[in-house]
Regions:
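Short catalytic/ligand-gating loop segments at beta-alpha or beta-beta junctions
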Residues: 146-151, 175
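Beta-strand-turn-beta hairpins that frame and shape the catalytic cleft
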Residues: 160, 178-182
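Short, surface-exposed beta-strand/loop micro-motifs that present aromatic residues
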Residues: 171-178
Length: 221
């Protein structure tokens, strides 16, 4: 059986993403500013700096580490993979990029007093509530702990995206598209996988397994 090949778009650290994908039998191909190439079985949009707020009609109000070349490259990849009908998985920044692509917007900087956000390592850990009939609900149940590395979050949800997990009923932590093989999570499942995860935090590997199985389903029909 041919391995599932995943294009991973990234800028900074890539090791944890590659480790997770290999652990579930996939072959990751990691690139910074990849050209449009839909020969891969799926697209993983990884974490990183903030998206230029001009993409959702706002000026700079707290966004940092903007990489306009990366924004443009990943927008082009999103368009191509959607047109090709291939699965897309967004993590943290990738989750936010999917939301913006579908017409949503972001809170550019969460309040410093909000214990939910934490840009440091070790990260904050908090509970999320998931919809029972969602990807996450089927994998983990409706109540579980995740890590938190981000300082931005979904403000308005993109068109047709279905919110499937939230923190305290306030912030969207995950979504999925009802008809397209597209989903995203705000936390970093690759940072808590297998035996390396923090006590009580959900294991990220089942999510990567789901993504790879989805890619195989779409590839093999």
């Amino acid at each position: 059986m041919e391995p599932i090949r995943i294009l991973v778009s990234y800028k900074d650290s890539i090791q944890n993403y590659e480790t997770a994908l290999r652990a579930v039998g996939a072959e990751p191909v990691s690139q910074y500013l990849p050209g449009v190439d839909t020969s891969y079985d799926g697209l993983l949009l990884s974490g990183g700096g903030d998206i230029d707020p001009a993409y959702y009609g706002e000026g700079l109000e707290g966004s940092v580490r903007i990489d306009m070349d990366r924004d443009a490259a990943e927008y082009a990849l999103m368009k191509a993979y959607l047109e090709a009908g291939k699965p897309i998985f967004g993590i943290c920044r990738g989750h936010q990029l999917i939301n913006v692509y579908f017409g949503g917007s972001l809170v550019q900087h969460m309040p410093e007093t909000d214990q939910h956000r934490n840009g440091d390592d070790p990260p904050a850990v908090h509970r999320v509530t998931a919809e029972a009939d969602s990807i996450l609900g089927r994998l983990y149940g409706t109540d579980f702990l995740v890590n938190s590395y981000h300082h931005q979050v979904v403000k308005s949800l993109g068109h047709q995206l279905r919110p499937t997990a939230s923190w305290n009923g306030r912030y969207v932590e995950a979504f999925e598209h009802p008809t397209l093989p597209v989903f995203g999570v705000q936390w970093h499942p690759e940072k808590d996988q297998g035996d390396a995860r923090r006590l009580g935090v959900v294991d990220g590997l089942p999510m990567f397994q789901y993504f790879v199985d989805l890619c195989r389903k779409y590839r093999d029909g």
